[in-house]
C-alpha cells in the first residue's frame, strides 16, 4: 500500500527532451535496454564503493546482478537490480530533473534534422528517459541500501507533463524499472529479442545480466523457471586484448560513454612494474555538445583493483585532452581514494604523465595511418588540441606535430597542413615558419601582408581560430624553426629578402619629405611612418613591433573583458603605388590630410576588420570621390 503520495510536474527541460527523444531516437529504440542496464551497472558500482567503508550496506546480499524479465499478458518488461537504490529525495532529483548545466542551450541546438538530433541526444546521455521511447508508462520501485523496508519509493509517469511519487514497502534493496510497453512495441516481449539486445550492448559489462528462463524435464515438458546469466559479465579491460574483438571494444565504449557513434580509435594497455595499472582509452568520433562549457564533466572512470571508485576523474588527463574517454584500473591507489587525495598524489602524477603520453601516441598513430580519419577528428577536436602548447610544456613538440592549419599552399579553408608538411616545402634559405592571424580565413587569405610572400612563392599559414594567437604566444618554434608573424613591422626574411636596389634608394630619398609630412600630420596616433617595398597591389598597411600586442591578441583580451593596452601601429606606405605617388604631390594641406587619413583608415580596416569611426571614413570617401 502506497503512502504520502504526491504528483509533481517535470522540469520544463525534461518535457522538451522526452518529446524530442521519442521522435529522434525511434529508429534506434532498442537502446532503452542498454541504457537501463548501464544504470543498473552504475548502481552496483556505487554500492561496492560505499560498502568498502560500510559492509552492512550489502544486507547479506553481496552477489550483485541485474535481472531482465517480461510479462507478455501484462505487456511489461522489468529491469531489476540489487545495487545502491534511491531515497525519495534522490528519486525526485534524478528522475524529475536533468541535473546538467547548459541543458537549455543543448535543447536550443536541436533542430529538425532527426539524424543529427539522434546523435546530439546520444551525446547528451538520455539514460533513464530512454524508457519512454517504447513505454507509455514507466513505474519505478526503489529502496536505498541501508534504509528500512518501509522507506522504499514508488515513482510513476506517462512521460508527459507530470509524475507521481509515493512511499511503499520493498523488502529487497535496489531498483525495479517496469516498462508498460506501447501497443506497437510488443516485439520486445520476446525472450530471444531481449537476449539479442543484451548480447549486442551489454555482454561486456562487469555485472551479471540474468533472464528468467523456462526449465524443461527430460521429456521436454516445462517444469519450472530459473534465472540464467546471459552475458560474459567479466570486466572487459581485465581480459587480454587479443581476446577482445573490435565489436566488443566498440560496444564497451558505448556503454561507458552512452554515445551512439563508434569511436575513431582505442588503446588497451596493461602495465606492470613500479606502476601497475590497466588503461582503456578511446578517441570519440564526435565532439560532445558542451565541450567548451566550463562545467563540462570530463575525465576517466577510475577503478582501484577492479572496484569502481568514481566517474569523471579529470586528474588523469590534461584539459586539452578532455575529449578522451575510457577508464583506468590502478593497483597502487588506496581503495578509499578521494578527489582531494588524487589532486596532490605522486601516483596520480605518474599515471597522468603516462596516460597523456599514451593518448598523444594514439593520435600520432591515427594521423600517420589514416590521414582522412585524423582530419575528421581534427574538425571535431582541433580547437581543444590547440590548448596543448600552453598547457603542456613537456609535450609541446608532440602536440605541435598534431596541429593542422590552412595555408596558401592549398586553395580551401580546410585545416590540413601540418608543421612538418610546411617545413618539407620551405624555400632554400628560408629559416622561419611564416603565418598570419585574422578574424576569418577570407580575411587572412586576402591580407595585403601576403603580397610579397605570394610574389616570392613562400608558403604562409592562414590562422583564423580565436585561440590561434594565444596558442602562438606559447608555440614560438618548431623543429628549430621560429614561427614568425608576417604582420610584424620588423619582419626579417633573411636570405629570402630582396637586396636593396638603386631604385629603392632613390625612392627613399625622393619620398623623405613626404614621410615627414605624414609623421607630422599623424603625430602620436602611430608609432612611426615609413616606406615599405613588401607590397605590390596595396598602397599602405599597418603593422606592429615584435614587443607589441598583436591585433588579434588585443581582440581576444577585449572579448574576455580584460584591459587592453593601446596598440600603436607602424604606418607603411608603398612608393610604387599610384595613390601614394599622387598624395605625395598634393600641396594643399587640407586635401593632403584627407588622403593620408583615407590611406590610414584603409590600412586599419584591412588589419582590424573594423574602424572606430566608420561614419567619418564613409564621409571622407564621399568627399574625395565628389
Swiss-Prot record:
PANTHER family cross-referenced by the UniProt entry: HEAT SHOCK PROTEIN 90 FAMILY MEMBER
Cross-referenced Pfam families: HATPase_c_3, HSP90
InterPro entries in the cross-refs: HATPase_C_sf, Heat_shock_protein_90_CS, HSP90_C, Hsp90_fam, Hsp90_N, Ribosomal_Su5_D2-typ_SF
Annotated stretches, region: A: 1-339
Positions of region (B): 340-555
GO molecular function: ATP binding; ATP hydrolysis activity; ATP-dependent protein folding chaperone; unfolded protein binding
Protein name listed in UniProt: Chaperone protein HtpG
Region (C): 556-626
Oligomer status and interactors: Homodimer.
Gene Ontology cellular-component terms listed: cytosol
Function according to Swiss-Prot or TrEMBL: Molecular chaperone. Has ATPase activity.
Keywords from the UniProt entry: ATP-binding, Chaperone, Cytoplasm, Nucleotide-binding, Stress response
A GO biological-process term: DNA damage response
PROSITE patterns linked: HSP90 (PS00298)
Location within or outside the cell: Cytoplasm
Family: Belongs to the heat shock protein 90 family.
Organism: Haemophilus influenzae (strain ATCC 51907 / DSM 11121 / KW20 / Rd)
Amino acid at each position: 500500500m502506497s503512502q504520502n503520495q504526491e504528483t509533481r510536474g517535470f522540469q520544463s527541460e525534461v518535457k522538451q527532451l522526452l518529446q524530442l527523444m521519442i521522435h529522434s531516437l525511434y529508429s534506434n529504440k532498442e537502446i532503452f535496454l542498454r541504457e537501463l542496464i548501464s544504470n543498473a551497472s552504475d548502481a552496483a558500482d556505487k554500492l561496492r564503493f560505499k560498502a568498502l567503508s560500510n559492509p552492512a550496506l550489502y544486507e547479506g546480499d553481496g552477489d550483485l546482478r541485474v535481472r531482465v524479465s517480461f510479462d507478455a499478458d501484462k505487456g511489461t518488461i522489468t529491469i531489476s537490480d540489487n545495487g545502491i537504490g534511491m531515497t525519495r529525495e534522490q528519486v525526485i532529483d534524478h528522475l524529475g530533473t536533468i541535473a546538467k548545466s547548459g541543458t537549455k542551450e543543448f535543447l536550443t541546438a536541436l533542430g529538425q534534422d532527426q539524424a543529427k538530433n539522434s546523435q546530439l541526444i546520444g551525446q547528451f546521455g538520455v539514460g533513464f528517459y530512454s524508457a519512454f521511447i517504447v513505454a507509455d508508462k514507466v513505474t519505478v520501485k526503489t529502496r536505498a541500501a541501508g534504509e528500512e523496508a518501509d522507506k522504499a519509493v514508488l515513482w510513476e509517469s506517462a512521460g508527459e507533463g507530470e509524475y507521481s511519487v509515493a512511499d511503499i514497502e520493498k523488502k529487497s534493496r535496489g531498483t525495479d524499472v517496469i516498462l508498460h510497453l506501447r501497443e506497437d512495441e510488443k516485439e520486445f516481449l520476446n525472450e530471444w529479442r531481449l537476449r539479442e539486445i543484451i548480447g549486442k550492448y551489454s555482454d561486456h559489462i562487469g555485472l551479471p545480466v540474468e533472464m528468467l528462463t523456462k526449465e524443461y524435464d527430460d521429456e521436454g515438458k516445462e517444469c519450472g523457471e530459473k534465472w540464467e546469466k546471459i552475458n560474459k559479465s567479466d570486466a572487459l579491460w581485465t581480459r587480454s586484448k587479443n581476446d577482445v574483438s573490435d565489436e566488443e571494444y566498440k560496444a564497451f565504449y558505448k556503454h561507458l560513454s552512452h554515445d551512439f557513434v563508434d569511436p575513431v580509435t582505442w588503446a588497451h594497455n596493461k602495465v606492470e612494474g613500479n606502476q601497475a595499472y590497466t588503461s582503456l582509452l578511446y578517441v570519440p568520433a564526435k565532439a560532445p555538445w558542451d565541450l567548451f562549457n566550463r562545467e563540462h564533466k570530463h575525465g576517466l572512470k577510475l577503478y582501484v583493483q577492479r572496484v569502481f571508485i568514481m566517474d569523471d576523474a579529470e586528474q588523469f588527463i590534461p584539459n586539452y585532452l578532455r575529449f578522451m574517454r575510457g577508464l583506468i584500473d590502478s593497483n597502487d591507489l588506496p581503495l578509499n581514494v578521494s578527489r582531494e587525495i588524487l589532486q596532490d598524489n605522486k601516483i596520480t602524477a605518474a599515471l597522468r604523465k603516462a596516460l597523456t603520453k599514451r593518448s598523444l601516441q594514439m593520435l600520432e598513430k591515427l594521423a600517420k595511418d589514416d590521414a582522412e580519419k585524423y582530419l575528421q577528428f581534427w574538425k571535431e577536436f582541433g580547437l581543444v588540441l590547440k590548448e596543448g602548447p600552453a598547457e603542456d610544456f613537456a609535450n609541446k613538440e608532440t602536440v605541435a606535430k598534431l596541429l593542422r592549419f590552412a595555408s596558401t599552399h592549398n586553395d580551401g579553408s580546410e585545416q590540413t597542413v601540418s608543421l612538418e608538411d610546411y617545413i618539407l616545402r620551405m624555400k632554400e634559405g628560408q629559416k622561419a615558419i611564416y603565418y598570419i592571424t585574422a578574424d576569418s580565413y577570407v580575411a587572412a587569405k586576402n591580407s595585403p601582408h601576403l603580397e610579397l610572400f605570394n610574389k616570392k612563392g613562400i608558403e604562409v599559414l592562414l590562422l583564423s581560430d580565436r585561440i590561434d594567437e594565444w596558442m602562438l604566444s606559447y608555440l614560438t618554434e618548431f623543429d628549430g624553426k621560429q614561427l614568425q608573424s608576417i604582420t610584424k613591422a620588423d619582419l626579417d626574411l633573411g636570405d629570402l629578402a630582396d637586396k636593396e636596389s638603386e631604385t629603392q634608394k632613390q625612392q627613399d630619398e625622393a619620398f623623405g619629405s613626404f614621410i615627414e609630412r605624414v609623421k607630422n600630420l599623424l603625430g602620436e596616433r602611430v608609432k612611426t611612418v615609413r616606406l615599405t617595398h613588401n607590397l605590390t597591389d596595396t598602397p599602405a598597411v599597418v603593422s606592429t613591433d615584435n614587443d607589441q600586442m598583436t591585433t588579434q591578441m588585443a581582440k581576444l583580451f577585449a572579448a574576455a573583458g580584460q584591459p587592453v593596452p593601446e596598440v600603436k601601429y607602424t604606418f607603411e606606405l608603398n612608393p610604387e603605388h599610384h595613390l601614394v605617388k599622387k598624395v605625395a604631390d598634393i600641396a594643399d594641406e587640407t586635401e593632403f590630410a584627407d588622403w593620408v587619413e583615407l590611406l590610414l583608415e584603409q590600412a586599419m580596416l584591412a588589419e582590424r576588420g573594423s574602424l572606430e569611426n566608420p561614419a567619418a571614413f564613409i564621409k571622407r570617401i564621399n568627399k574625395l570621390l565628389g
